Swiss-Prot record:
This is HTH-type transcriptional regulator AldR. In the presence of alanine, AldR changes its quaternary structure from a homodimer to an octamer with an open-ring conformation. The binding affinity of AldR for the ald control region is increased significantly by L-alanine. In vitro, L-cysteine also increases the binding affinity of AldR for the target DNA. Keywords: Activator, DNA-binding, Repressor, Transcription, Transcription regulation. Residues 1-21 are annotated as: Disordered. The keyword Transcription regulation applies.
Length: 171
């Protein structure tokens, strides 16, 4: 999470400015689409692709980072390739008296090596956890030791992931 933003994603003082879609022009959008497809594209190739000078392209990418549009560049690791062949989405509901412990739950659960993503929700469930495990026993152990054993957790529901496909750019 970027410096200056809270765990819930609410902007706080010192966080990147509030960027509106209208602040992005066609060139910014083309840069973002190209980086979404290949975040490792060399700046010179990116500049050529969008039709601007490399120095201009570099400045625009830096600006998009500074204002918080580009949050980072990540390595997409295949969990199965590193021995974590089973993935699941786990819906988690906290006890109604545990609402004040949401931040501590998030901070704790993010430290678990099986947790790939944490989604804080509105609706019937409080969270969805995207987890990776070696096998069903490893997944069961994660749920029992990290969720069922937590007195603040009211319930969980686990759905196995058969295939994970990356979605389109949000543009």
């Amino acid at each position: 999470m970027s410096e200056g933003s809270s765990i819930t994603g609410v902007q706080t003082p010192g966080s990147p400015k509030d960027v509106r879609a209208r602040d992005l022009d066609d060139i910014d959008r083309r840069i973002l689409l190209a980086l979404h497809d290949d975040a490792r594209i060399p700046n010179s190739a990116l500049a050529e692709m969008v039709g601007i000078a490399p120095s201009t392209c570099h400045g625009r990418v830096r600006r998009l980072q500074e204002i918080g549009v580009i949050r980072g560049f990540y390595t997409d690791i295949d969990p199965a390739a590193v021995g974590l062949g089973l993935q699941a989405m786990i819906s988690v509901s906290l006890q109604s008296n545990a609402r004040g412990k949401i931040r501590s739950f998030i901070a704790h659960i993010r430290t678990r090596p099986q947790v790939m993503d944490v989604y804080f929700l509105a609706g019937g469930d409080d969270f969805i956890l995207h987890v990776a495990a070696r096998d069903t026993e490893d997944l069961r152990k994660f749920v029992v030791e990290n969720l069922n054993a937590d007195s603040d957790v009211a319930g969980t529901q686990t759905s196995l992931i058969f295939e994970h496909l990356r979605g389109a750019s949000p543009l």
